[in-house]
């Protein structure tokens, strides 16, 4: 009896050890029959990351995190809904304002009076400061001796800024969405062109010549 009980204990121990050594069936089971089991991917050291790895990591973070609409790139932001009840068919600018809401927009500004690049920098800086005080977020870039770009993050305010610029004394012209708007200082070049024309007319006018001949005839009579 003692020997048989001892033998049973040894057999139970061997069976238990075999069960422990066997891997679980989940390790070999797959969702689809015949699919090969891929070993787990070895984790890469972050010190060995290249630009492609960093881009994938950033993309994964963007998927996992909830990013606000204002922080998204412009091409990924949802378009603002358009309230057609507020549109005026007689004013095309009102339609453009609604469609450009929340989108970046640029306008070109030309300075009158043949300024230097430094003068253009100073003049446009004053305009930018006035717009900033009126709560308009505008960025400014000088692209020539008499030309600058005003860039807005919200294009719906572009036409209000255009109205401000064209009323400035040194603003010759504003170009917005392919449309050219003459400024208050746009007539300076035309005035400069008309001045020599007036001078030429005076020189070619026959009346002054007739008056000179009359003066000569009068002087001859006095001599006689």
Swiss-Prot record:
Matches recorded under Pfam families: Mesd
Biased composition annotated in UniProt, kind: Basic and acidic residues: 187-224
Chain segments carrying region Disordered: 178-224
Motif (Prevents secretion from ER): 221-224
Molecular-function GO terms, alphabetical: identical protein binding; low-density lipoprotein particle receptor binding
InterPro entries given in the database record: MESD
Carbohydrate attachment residues: 192
Subcellular localization(s) per the UniProt record: Endoplasmic reticulum
Endpoints of the signal sequence: 1-29
Main location: endoplasmic reticulum
GO biological process: ossification; phagocytosis; positive regulation of skeletal muscle acetylcholine-gated channel clustering; protein folding; protein localization to cell surface; Wnt signaling pathway
This protein's UniProt keywords: Chaperone, Endoplasmic reticulum, Glycoprotein, Signal, Wnt signaling pathway
Region (Escort domain): 156-195
Physiological role: Chaperone specifically assisting the folding of beta-propeller/EGF modules within the family of low-density lipoprotein receptors (LDLRs). Acts as a modulator of the Wnt pathway through chaperoning the coreceptors of the canonical Wnt pathway, LRP5 and LRP6, to the plasma membrane. Essential for specification of embryonic polarity and mesoderm induction. Plays an essential role in neuromuscular junction (NMJ) formation by promoting cell-surface expression of LRP4. May regulate phagocytosis of apoptotic retinal pigment epithelium (RPE) cells.
Complex formation: Monomer. Interacts with LRP5; the interaction prevents LRP5 from forming aggregates and chaperones LRP6 to the plasma membrane. Interacts with LRP6; the interaction prevents LRP6 from forming aggregates and chaperones LRP6 to the plasma membrane. Interacts with LRP4; the interaction promotes glycosylation of LRP4 and its cell-surface expression.
Comment block on domains: The chaperone domain provides a folding template for proper folding of the beta-propeller (BP) domains of LRP5/6.
Protein name: LRP chaperone MESD
């Amino acid at each position: 009896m003692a020997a048989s009980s001892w033998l049973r204990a040894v057999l139970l121990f061997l069976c238990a050890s075999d069960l422990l050594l066997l891997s679980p069936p989940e390790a070999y089971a797959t969702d689809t029959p015949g699919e090969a089991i891929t070993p787990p991917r070895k984790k890469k050291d972050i010190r060995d990351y290249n630009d492609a790895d960093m881009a994938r990591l950033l993309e994964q973070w963007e998927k996992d995190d909830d990013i606000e609409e204002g922080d998204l790139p412009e091409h990924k932001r949802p378009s603002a809904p358009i309230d057609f009840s507020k549109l005026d068919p007689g004013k095309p600018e009102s339609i453009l304002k609604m469609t450009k809401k929340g989108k970046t927009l640029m306008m070109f500004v030309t300075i009158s009076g043949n300024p230097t690049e430094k003068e253009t920098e100073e003049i446009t800086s004053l305009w930018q400061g006035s717009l900033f005080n009126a709560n308009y977020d505008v960025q400014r870039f000088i692209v020539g001796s008499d030309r600058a770009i005003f860039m807005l993050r919200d294009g719906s305010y572009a036409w209000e800024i255009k109205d401000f610029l064209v009323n400035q004394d040194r603003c010759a012209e504003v170009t917005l969405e392919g449309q050219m708007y003459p400024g208050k200082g746009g007539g300076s070049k035309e005035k400069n062109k008309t001045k020599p024309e007036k001078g030429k007319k005076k020189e070619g006018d026959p009346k002054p010549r007739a008056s000179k001949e009359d003066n000569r005839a009068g002087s001859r009579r006095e001599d006689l």
